[in-house]
Amino acid sequence: MEPLYEEILTQGGTIVKPYYWLSLSLGCTNCPYHIRTGEEARVPYTEFHQTFGFPWSTYPQTKHLTFYELRSSSKNLIQKGLASNCTGSHNHPEAMLFEKNGYLDAVIFHNSNIRHIILYSNNSPCNEAKHCCISKMYNFLMNYPEVTLSVFFSQLYHTEKQFPTSAWNRKALQSLASLWPQVTLSPICGGLWHAILEKFVSNISGSTVPQPFIAGRILADRYNTYEINSIIAAKPYFTDGLLSRQKENQNREAWAAFEKHPLGSAAPAQRQPTRGQDPRTPAVLMLVSNRDLPPIHVGSTPQKPRTVVRHLNMLQLSSFKVKDVKKPPSGRPVEEVEVMKESARSQKANKKNRSQWKKQTLVIKPRICRLLER
């Protein structure tokens, strides 16, 4: 394999100079060392903020920056580094890393333990004629089928309809995503921002990492998630909880304006939060499977149980009709009982005839229930 670069060892890592850059470009501040490894891959926080749009939302810029990690099959880190674009020769970082007989090709050739390549880019890879980044990445993966590639980005590059190359870039992203599970494409969001800061930004530790997320950054991450899913025709199987219900209701108007205008067109100094709204909206990343979500009713609104109140009219006594009490109701038997009642004159009769009992028949009629007719 013919080497196409020169790697120079430094105290913190290495700097790489491709051989075909025979002269320095006066219009590029990174020439000729566009690839750096180890601690040389760290950048100042100001540069990271301007390039990746963190913690503010993204805004138009022309600089391309890609951090990368090379890991083994057991996920152990073998090498970390960065690649920057060249404004003089108009090369993108992905094109430098994945070109045939390029840097990653040579590194894997000398270290067969590399099984995972992870990219953290401020822009998604493109496939425009001057760069052909996705084509080089695709061919690289065809030569190394045992190597997986995970691409994380902070904004999509030239995929909107106003760009002439948008259809070409979207089609190329679909082709790259078709290599799943060897390839995954995802936006940077949630705790991944803090991990990148700790690994690739200078003078950053766990205590100094900015914890709160700005609402504009959260909205941009959500927009990137659904946009990349629509491009590669993938269904989002997880729902993120980046905003609480209360904050989400407060930011509905901002979200509507966000869809109509470019992402974060104003600089951080120009942004002024409205009164009564906290500009620092905390972000909590929650992955919830659709199977754990409550069922969603589609179509008409499900009927709620109705409460039925029955009104009862009080019955008036004047409305009752009482049947003749002398007549027993039909079907009711009359019981006749014969009893022996002592006569009032028994005392006189006893004198004459010791005792005399008179039979009297007493008819006892059962009580007649009053029949109420409505």
Swiss-Prot record:
Tissue specificity as recorded in UniProt: Predominantly expressed in testis.
Domain CMP/dCMP-type deaminase: 60-176
GO biological process, one term: mRNA processing
EC code: 3.5.4.-
Cofactor: Zn(2+)
Family: Belongs to the cytidine and deoxycytidylate deaminase family.
Keyword Isomerase set for record: no
Residues binding Zn(2+), per UniProt: 92, 126, 133
Top-rank lineage group of the source organism: Eukaryota
A Pfam family it matches: NAD1
Family matches, as PANTHER family: C-U-EDITING ENZYME APOBEC-4-RELATED (PTHR35672:SF1)
Gene3D superfamilies listed in its UniProt record: Cytidine Deaminase, domain 2 (3.40.140.10)
Role this protein plays: Putative C to U editing enzyme whose physiological substrate is not yet known.
Keywords: Hydrolase, Metal-binding, mRNA processing, Zinc
Enzyme active site: 94 (proton donor)
Protein's name in the database: Putative C->U-editing enzyme APOBEC-4
Top EC class, one word: hydrolase
Keyword flag Hydrolase: yes
Annotated segments matching region Disordered: 259-280
